Amino acid sequence: MAMPTNHAILSASSSHRWLECPPSAKLCAELPDTSSEYAQEGTDAHALCEHRLKALLGRETTDPTENLTYYNEEMERCAVEYATYAYEQVKKAKVACNDPIVLIEQKLDFSRWVPEGFGTGDCVIVADGTLSVIDFKYGKGVEVRAENNPQMMLYALGALELFDGIYDISAVNMIIFQPRRDNISEYAISKEELLRWANEILTPTAQLAANGDGDFKAGKHCRFCKVRATCRKLAEYNLALARYDFEPPATLDNIEIAAILAKADELVSWVTDVKEYALRQALSGVSYDGFKVVEGRSNRKYTDENEVVEAVKSAGYDPYEHSVLGITAMTSLLGKKKFNELLGGLIEKPQGKPTLVSISDKRPAIHTANEDFKEEK
């Protein structure tokens, strides 16, 4: 979804949070929105996707690239991949329906279930019996899944509001297209299942959230919450690990270590957020017992690189480093096709450094030395 400039209190993009923790919605609404480079980059990518898809469909469109701050070859490639994929979905829809409806960047109103609820669907395809909603995600930090994704389900409800009376829709397809994670995630649900969820779970929870009622609940949904640094429930949730009732003996057993690992990343992230929040507050005049603000370490830098170059050259030395461009920079220089032609046979991908992750991670487990030894025996 493109980043809207005006947010509803109960937005689709934050629904994963307020459905789990209803009172967080009003608390977050009281704080100002803060933009980031990642958010602006995503906005640029969505604008380019819209243009590329409209062009494929033969619709009137204006190339936005000269106005995109973060436009680069990777963004272009991702936009073309998205447009091509969405266009293929349109062609599939035409097999079942001669003239499917295709909406791009369509405002979707789901306020029948969520007070003032609306969002923007990147691509909505409506054909006889089937509604498809495609959402483009440019982020690469977290892989987004379509299965039981509340944001996608809200978009689907908004699309049903527009078209269910015109088309006899019975099935809903929800698709996440996330090219920088090589992730295309699909989830199909019947209209009846979607409406049952909307009436039995969504509506009552949304009403609680709109009123600031309900119980606070900490969990993975807290990751992008605006009040996570000062939330008491999240603090209790994370500090519970510090109060873990470790039993003798003096060393932890595997079960205790697994319990710590399950929360370690969230704990580290939360502590970082608290420290950043405290620094901002301290810089604005807040005092914390036992702490003070000091000047951090800094590195020396040249005041004028051009003068440095001239001075070093005049002394008879070469001021520049000389090394082969890295793979990403070389791909940008040559283009992906030329890069593969010239250097495809000279590229290898060594094994990655072993890392311990949750069992839910999609990557296959590697064989440890101990397992190999057991197999040999």
Predicted segment positions?
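Charged, polyampholytic interaction/assembly segments that form long, compositionally biased interfaces
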Residues: 286-377
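Contiguous, amphipathic alpha-helical segments that mediate oligomerization or scaffolding
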Residues: 243-298
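Mg2+/Mn2+-dependent nuclease catalytic core
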Residues: 40, 98-207
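Hydrophobic/aromatic-lined pockets within catalytic cores
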Residues: 53-57, 138-141, 156-164, 207-210, ...
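Alpha-helix N-cap/helix-initiation motif
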Residues: 34, 38, 143-145, 253
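Charge-rich, acidic-biased intrinsically disordered regions
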Residues: 65-74, 221, 228, 279-306
